């Protein structure tokens, strides 16, 4: 099966580097499926899960808060603002953060409070979507 080199990097660390058969991510125009030999492409990433399909048929799922996806025919690079392996996401902490953001939104005192609360809600929604992908994979 054909493969391509994939690198998923955050500001803090390299999350994944190796051969993959496919990468699935949410770009600016919607969900993208990248296979070896894909036409060159650069797009902004939307917050949410990135699915990396490995040669052995297994799948890695990584949460990204946003960033850039660069595709070359045999190399795909994810430069993420924040990237966390989905297995390392703490669902209880995310639910607590969502609750806090909802309270902040309900008690907003300024447009800045509202913007911060909406950003936090969007981030927690993307993290919970990533957790759901992991749970679906396990079934």
Swiss-Prot record:
SUPFAM superfamilies: Epsilon subunit of F1F0-ATP synthase C-terminal domain (SSF46604), Epsilon subunit of F1F0-ATP synthase N-terminal domain (SSF51344). Keywords: ATP synthesis, Cell inner membrane, Cell membrane, CF(1), Hydrogen ion transport, Ion transport, Membrane, Transport. It is found in: Cell inner membrane. It is a peripheral membrane protein. GO terms for molecular function: ATP binding; proton-transporting ATP synthase activity, rotational mechanism. PANTHER family: ATP SYNTHASE DELTA/EPSILON CHAIN (PTHR13822), ATP SYNTHASE EPSILON CHAIN, CHLOROPLASTIC (PTHR13822:SF10). This is ATP synthase epsilon chain. CDD domains: F1-ATPase_delta. InterPro entries: ATP_F1_dsu/esu_C_sf, ATP_synth_F1_dsu/esu, ATP_synth_F1_dsu/esu_N, ATPsynth_dsu/esu_N. NCBIfam families: ATP_synt_epsi (TIGR01216), PRK00571.1-4 (NF001847). Produces ATP from ADP in the presence of a proton gradient across the membrane.
């Amino acid at each position: 099966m054909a493969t391509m080199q994939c690198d998923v990097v955050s500001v803090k660390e390299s999350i994944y580097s190796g051969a993959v058969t496919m990468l699935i991510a949410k770009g600016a125009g919607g969900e993208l499926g990248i296979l070896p030999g894909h036409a060159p492409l650069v797009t902004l990433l939307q917050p949410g899960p990135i699915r990396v399909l490995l040669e052995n048929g297994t799948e890695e799922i990584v949460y990204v808060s946003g960033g850039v996806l660069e595709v070359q025919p045999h190399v795909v690079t994810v430069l993420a603002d924040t990237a966390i392996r989905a297995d390392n996401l703490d669902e209880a902490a995310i639910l607590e953060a969502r609750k806090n953001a909802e309270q902040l939104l309900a008690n907003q005192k300024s447009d800045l409070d509202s913007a911060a609360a909406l950003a936090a809600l969007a981030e927690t929604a993307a993290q919970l979507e990533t957790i759901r992908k992991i749970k679906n994979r396990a079934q």
